[in-house]
A protein has these predicted regions:
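Core alpha/beta nucleotide-donor-binding catalytic domains of modification enzymes
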Residues: 1-195
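ATP/NTP-dependent adenylation/nucleotidyl-transfer catalytic domains that generate, transfer
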Residues: 185-250
Length: 250
């Protein structure tokens, strides 16, 4: 996987080379593997860890684990405890906003160039079904974006099995999040119930779905380019007004 990861960076994310990177590490397998891969490539990195106290001692143990990982590797470690008191159905969305707001604060304060998160192919599949269930357009069916402003997701082409295999093959330890086994959230229900059924139907479901998301992204780009070309030819801006040429309405 290390060779594939290096090639992916060289071919698709070459702008990361020589940059200062803030790696977001929860302590789970995905983020610890991302940390390991990036650290082996000799980037200048720091690690950011959020503790939302949602699992009490387990959450504190995660923080200690990540802090110790950074000490062993002599990597700068940034940690923040969040005390959120919000309705259960809003926890994930609120936590996400708090998390990314803080990551961007660290980016500015410590002069990092990019924020790296450990989202992978399985996460993108789950996001597809979440958006599909809530009604969406083509944008919502393209999965998780590999690049979003300063946030980069280098593991997106890799599936969960590849990540776990790499961790086991390299004796990498990680923390298990017990909440992932519960079906309290829609994402967990999709991960634990829907996706296994789809894999039973087609053992190569994950790889096939990856191709589908790729094609949807390509189609979305073509559509956006067509719309932009149409606007550039038929729309005009004048005195804070947008004018549409009559020929465009025929």
């Amino acid at each position: 996987m290390l060779d594939l990861f290096n090639k992916h960076i060289d071919n698709n994310l070459p702008f990361l080379h020589g940059k200062k990177l803030l790696v977001c590490v929860s302590g789970g397998a995905d983020s610890v593997v991302l940390f390991s891969l990036i650290n082996k490539m000799n980037y200048t990195i720091g690690v950011a860890h959020c503790n939302f106290k949602l699992r009490h001692k387990e959450s504190d143990d995660d923080s200690f684990f990540v802090e110790n990982l950074c000490k062993i590797n002599s990597i700068p470690f940034y940690s923040k405890d969040f005390d959120i008191n919000i309705p259960k159905h809003s926890v994930q969305m609120a936590a996400r906003k708090l998390r990314y707001d803080w990551f961007y604060e660290l980016l500015e304060l410590h002069k990092y160039d990019f924020i790296l998160t450990a989202h992978h192919l399985n996460d993108s599949i789950e996001t597809f079904f979440i958006n599909l269930s809530r009604s969406t357009g083509i944008d919502g069916l393209t999965g998780i974006k590999s690049i979003n402003n300063k946030v980069v997701r280098p593991l997106l082409p890799f599936n969960k099995s590849q990540i776990i295999d790499y961790a086991n093959d390299n004796n990498i330890k990680w923390r298990e999040d017990s909440s992932n086994l519960k079906d309290n959230y829609l994402r967990n229900k999709i991960r634990n119930k829907l996706v296994p059924i789809l894999r039973d139907i087609d053992s190569d479901f994950t790889n096939n779905f990856s191709k589908t998301i790729y094609r949807l992204n390509e189609s979305n780009l073509i559509l956006k380019e067509h719309i932009q070309n149409f606007k550039s030819v038929n729309f005009q801006t004048k005195n804070d007004e947008i004018l549409i040429l009559k020929t465009a309405l025929k």
